[in-house]
Amino acid sequence: MNKEKLIAFFKKETILCISGALAVVSAFIIPPDAGYIEYCDIRVLVLLFCLMAVMGGFQQLGVFDRMANLLLARARKMRQLATTLVMLCFFSAMFVTNDVALITFVPFTIMLLERANLREKMIPFIVMQTIAANLGSMLTPVGNPQNLFLYTISGMEMSEFFAVTVPYVGVSYFFLYVYCYFQGKQPLVTEKQEPKKQWSGNDKVFLLALGILFLLCLLAVFRIAPYQAIFVVILVWFIFFQKGILKGLDYNLLLTFVFFFVLIGNLGRIPVIRETLQNLLLGREVIVSFLASQFISNVPAAVLLSEFTTRYDLLIAGVNIGGLGTLIASMASLISYKYYAQAEGARKGRYMLYFTAMNILFAVILLAVNLFIPYLPVVHLA
């Protein structure tokens, strides 16, 4: 039974297990010493924790469900339904992360399409929601873990960050909208789904408090307020008022970051590896980070490659485009797949074919943007 549990854990947390094993192996090459203390970027870990906690609080209150219900009540045609479901993920991911957007809206989409007898739309809509969440999250530093990490270690100004991301996100929005538009004018009837529960007086107080905590998180991300103080405030709130949220956070993601911090720290102290990776990245930051993301996922790719280049603008572009491609290129994509695989009548093979085809299409489009628009700050491939 223990063996079965270990196998199940490995399947669920593959990246965590591999990163942990690699960190241990690297520790045999570079034995633990005082230098290890400098490996971990505490600010990144703290901000990730704070954002996950606040988003968990919003989710528990049903904020995102209510928002979806209000928007879906306006849908009268297939293209309107597609636009609503896809753009919900696209825009919400900019502020609540791609993971939270998909965890919230994919189950909602499955339920809605089942009730509306539109199962044939389940694969295309969920795949496009996944692409939309990954690309929408590219816009802001808080949209996904790799952005938060790279923005934090780079010291970039907000204007510099947006100069990198806005062109890609703008192009992504255009093509996502075109896709939704061509879903057609087929009339449909969608009923407004009542929230699971009405907000009580306490819920409203919690909602206000969480809104304030989210603003404090943003102040810390943008380096306006000290992250240490924000961490204390958020930790105290959740310990005393929403302790259950703390139990459900994705601590494995934080631990994965720690393992990769150790790994890249040790690799950086091995001269031959450091020189090889620096030479490999030089002038090829976008394509190398894109390809690395296909095999190890874009968050680990960002952490790993950041040690060997100072072109964080190119790295931001590469790992975000790198979220398109294989199912593991962005770990958020696995969330959608797992939800779909549990749906009645799921056709996993067809899902994978459609997922791969659409991801490749959008990846090619965005790589073309990188290559052929010379005024983009990230175009330094030669």
Language-model segments: which ranges?
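Long, contiguous bundles of hydrophobic transmembrane helices that form the permeation core
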Residues: 2-4, 174-235
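Hydrophobic mid-bilayer segments of alpha-helices in multi-pass membrane transport proteins
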Residues: 4-29, 41-53, 206-215, 223-238, ...
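Interfacial loop-to-helix junctions that mark the boundaries of transmembrane helices
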Residues: 5-12, 34-44, 156-168, 199-203, ...
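Transmembrane helical segments that form the transport core of multi-pass membrane transport proteins
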Residues: 39, 61, 65-68, 212-310
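Membrane-interfacial loop-to-helix junctions in multi-pass transporters
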Residues: 41-44, 73-86, 115-125, 204-208, ...
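Hydrophobic transmembrane alpha-helices that form the pore/transport pathway of multi-pass ion
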Residues: 87, 91-135, 149, 303-317, ...
